[in-house]
Amino acid sequence: MNYKDTLLMPKTDFPMRGGLPNKEPQIQEMWDNDDQYRKALEKNKNNPSFILHDGPPYANGNLHMGHALNKIIKDFIVRYKTMQGFYAPYVPGWDTHGLPIEQALTKKGVDRKKMSVAEFREKCKEFALKQIDIQKKDFKRLGVRGDFNNPYITLTPEYEAAQIRLFGEMADKGLIYKGKKPVYWSPSSESSLAEAEIEYHDKRSASIYVAFDVKDSKGKVDSDAQFIIWTTTPWTIPSNVAITVHPELKYGQYNVDGHKYIVAQALSEEVAEALGWDKDSIQLEKEFTGKELEFVEAQHPFLDRVSLVINGEHVTTDAGTGCVHTAPGHGEDDYIVGQKYDLPVISPLNDKGVFTEEGGPFEGMFYDKANKAVTDLLKEKDALLKLDFITHSYPHDWRTKKPVIFRATPQWFASINKVRQDILDAIEDTNFKVDWGKTRIYNMIRDRGEWVISRQRVWGVPLPVFYAENGDIIMTKETVNHVADLFEKHGSNIWFEKEAKELLPEGFSHPGSPNGEFTKETDIMDVWFDSGSSHRGVLETRPELSFPADLYFEGSDQYRGWFNSSITTAVATRGQAPYKFLLSHGFVMDGEGKKMSKSLGNVIVPDQVVKQKGADIARLWVSSTDYLSDVRISDEILKQTSDVYRKIRNTLRFMLGNINDFNPETDSIAETNLLEVDRYLLNRLREFTASTINNYENFDYLNIYQEVQNFINVELSNFYLDYGKDILYIEKKDSHKRRSMQTVLYQILVDMTKLLAPILVHTAEEVWSHTPHVKEESVHLSDMPKVVDVDEELLEKWNTFMNLRDDVNRALEQARNEKVIGKSLEAKVVIGSNESFNTAEFLQQFNDLQQLFIVSQVEVKDKVNDGVSYQYGDIHIKHAEGEKCERCWNYTEELGSVGELEHLCPRCQEVVKTLV
């Protein structure tokens, strides 16, 4: 007889190899055909909801790993919440307006000047929608489930109308105004920028010290003294109208070789060193506070203009001279302090950053090129004390990567000052996973200036503002709502297709327009106002969603972006934050923590990972990251992820193979009748389940990744599944011992598949389709396992046993190295108590020790004279006695010796007898 034919070997059609790149699209097609997203919602439609509001990615360009990280974690969250019984719709969105799309069309050869604004905008729209189709397909390929057939898009008429109405409510509250203020201005984009559109890079700049002669000392300083200022923007000197000093700082008039200079005393040594003064030749002649210097008049170094000495709290002693060059047309602090003194706002640059006629001798020069001309003129006037060059962190346009400037222009603003405290209070009411997230957005709101919301572009939502003949601004509830209604019906292109009069309510009149003529605003809204209105355009508009959302989750750059603009508009109009919980992730770097770039050749993109390895590998990688900070990816990291995946897959396959003849309805053993080792594993499963559920609740996916590996490697592979082979393969098919183990194995398989489902979406579905007797058609329509109390006493007992078993394994390994045994079934374990542990008494509680140790024989003694001492007993390993059973390979002294049952141990004889 071939005894192999009598073994109950694993059987399953579940393949060992994943073949994910080919298999995943088939599974996704099945989900689409079954409309699984709708089924998942329908299942929980009467339950409490959980709303994760999708921050809209920009509809331009292919997906990068940051997109994948973001969308995959969102999918973890929504799928988990759905399996926990929540009604959890997920509506993906796209941000579609703004300069990058205009630039993309220009690169494609679209000549904006050869068409009307409305025609150009139509091309922008077509481009954006094509980009959305590409990105949508790629997001779905990552296994992300959502309402992709009905996403929200910021260019749709209903969204734009909601945005206009929100704008109108802010205007009604006096939060929208027009003013000439210095704003971040990008000459390369020819537009103003919000703080969220600024990024900092190193830049080499001129560093100059300039002397301003005293013109009218007011009897406070010597008339032949000079104020020294320091600046890294020489091109702003033509706009200088003041010198700001701190009212409480002490200043000194210093005589240096007959020259009299005024600087802050706290900075005098640094100034002396910078200007190369001989310390022995410096004399402090006079002292005064900044307050005492107020209203002293200095002379502009090369213009016929007074530079007034004023007081400002923003002056520090971190660098410079303590006497701050002040040009209200080119700096926010300068502008604010200048307002108090009614100083003129001079900003002689055009949109391209080129000096206008107002710039005098610098007319026609690009501001950066004017630096040299200004310093040359200062030198000519003997006002330049020092010219140097420094490299410092400087604001750049996030799109063009070119430097920006502060430039005073007429702009539309949303007032932050009027709602700042309300926003800060709303942040206090918001939950955060990490304290630094709260600190970050709190400080940004606390410190940010007014929000410039106008842009001098065409591809965006028009500002719904009209002007009367006399220049009066028309922005009433009636006119704004009428524009919103028009946008909702026709889309915002109507603004560029119709005259102002046609966009106003029928019969509208205004005292400032006696002839009934009106003009319309040409600026559009900041794209952050677009996406920052999504709580109105989506949460409050879509019937399946609600305000506020339970969660906003985006990259950490959104503390100054979408998180910021959203809470600003929500607090301004609804008096509360649009999110209950705020969570963020870091950026994706290469394997060495460097930024990915084509030039370095270290770029990995989602499409490449999916085609080569599969979306589940990308998803498992995401779960393996500490996403709260920057994460790393490389071919080597993905190889490690693939190895972990293979281990998970093979473990699930092993369990599938060993329950092929098990029906939980008829073959299950009641928990009280399970073997104790099986009850131990059931309780370990419950511990693992409780921990995994807790980790999902706390968005701790790295913990899940690590604990899954630990459970599979330590509990299953290294013990239970290895131990179980002697039972599952060898025992009689329906023996109590075998059915006891299959009962627990089935539970482990089902629960693990559910717990892994939000992460390994395709593999879990594949396992589910091969699992016999499951009720739900899809694992994603099943519920998460319930958290059940564990038997602590049982776990404590078996945890001690597992530690003891580790000692036995160490002894077996030693015996293997010494050639006493080969495989562990060749061993007899002799074990006894020692001073550190009463092994003999402890092991009296356990049966079938030879199976638990995976050896042929175990002898427990009070004392082992020739054993090696371990923490949990003295252990001696011998070669097993007797001969090897040809069926189970255990050694015994009771081998059969007759006919069919020859060379079989008594246990195998009993099993085979039933088969003959």
From Swiss-Prot:
L-isoleucyl-5'-AMP binds at residue 554. It catalyses: tRNA(Ile) + L-isoleucine + ATP = L-isoleucyl-tRNA(Ile) + AMP + diphosphate. Keywords: Aminoacyl-tRNA synthetase, ATP-binding, Cytoplasm, Ligase, Metal-binding, Nucleotide-binding, Protein biosynthesis, Zinc. Its main location: cytoplasm. A motif ('KMSKS' region) lies at residues 595-599. GO terms for cellular component: cytosol. One of its GO terms (biological process) is isoleucyl-tRNA aminoacylation. Its cofactor is Zn(2+). Monomer. Catalyzes the attachment of isoleucine to tRNA(Ile). As IleRS can inadvertently accommodate and process structurally similar amino acids such as valine, to avoid such errors it has two additional distinct tRNA(Ile)-dependent editing activities. One activity is designated as 'pretransfer' editing and involves the hydrolysis of activated Val-AMP. The other activity is designated 'posttransfer' editing and involves deacylation of mischarged Val-tRNA(Ile). Belongs to the class-I aminoacyl-tRNA synthetase family. IleS type 1 subfamily. This is Isoleucine--tRNA ligase. It comes from Staphylococcus epidermidis (strain ATCC 35984 / DSM 28319 / BCRC 17069 / CCUG 31568 / BM 3577 / RP62A). The lineage of its organism: Bacteria, Bacillati, Bacillota, Bacilli, Bacillales.
